[in-house]
């Protein structure tokens, strides 16, 4: 059956969101005394959205037999765009009325508030993880074209290799925000689609070539952790083959996790939406406890950066996010997907 539930991909989603939470936790700690540790953790966790896009492409193709563009967009409007808009409200108020968001364009705060809000929503810059939504929306809009490739011209999947090399050269960030990110992540999304399309062959191929794929992964990790010159962009070198390896590894060994990651995987989109709020909340609390002052957007890394504090911080954020979503689901029932994305 084409849309048979893929437990290993479900577990992969739980692994991916855990790494994403870890990636956004790193900057909340002060790594002055442990820079190499920070670089290694950063290489492991940062840009794990690559895994999310691979999974999204895989599931898009896997479920494509029942694809209807209108109902597809309606569902994405309800479960992705609506919670994005609702959950953006606190951050939009904070970063247009009270605190200037770091990393914005020099001219940004000279613009009227309505334009600031529009630019925040178009780019996702108001909360670190939320660039994902404007970017994935571009994939939703071109879904019929992607499906046409899969159904009528699957030989075009060979373009994944040169597009991957282009992404390695260009990197994720550029002047066009979500468009740059979409270009960067496009080969990974297509890789997920291709893996699903040629599932049996792909599983055999990856199992046979696991060693060279692992070597490429480790080279990419070394390049990022040791700060080799850029370009190339090493996290794309690392995580595209790593996505293939994890897919096949979890296919064989997802039973090790049993159902421990099932709920985290099930609410992963909701975690993506809200976890940055808890990172910030803990940061505000720790600045007040340690420095005795109110956090105003700068100097929030008052906790020493090491493996123990990193794991504790990330796990706390993950648990707070999961608990919040669980409560929201209990209180709002089926409406929770529109409110918190899960």
Describe each PLM feature range:
Residues 49-62, 134-147, 169-203, 236-255, ...:
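Specific transmembrane alpha-helix
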Residues 2-3, 63-71, 148-154, 196-209, ...:
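Membrane-interface junctions at the ends of membrane-embedded or membrane-associated helices
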Residues 18, 50, 79-83, 87, ...:
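Hydrophobic alpha-helical membrane-embedded or membrane-associated segments
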Residues 1-163, 292-342:
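Membrane-cytosol interface segments of multi-pass membrane proteins
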Residues 202-270, 276-289, 293-294, 303-310:
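Alpha-helical transmembrane segments and terminal signal-anchor/GPI-anchor hydrophobic tails
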Residues 18-25, 160-173, 212-226, 271-277:
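Aromatic-anchored segments of alpha-helical transmembrane domains
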Residues 37-49, 120-135, 171-188, 221-245, ...:
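Interfacial loop-to-helix transition and helix-capping segments at the boundaries
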Residues 3-32, 143, 149, 172-182, ...:
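Transmembrane alpha-helical insertion/packing segments
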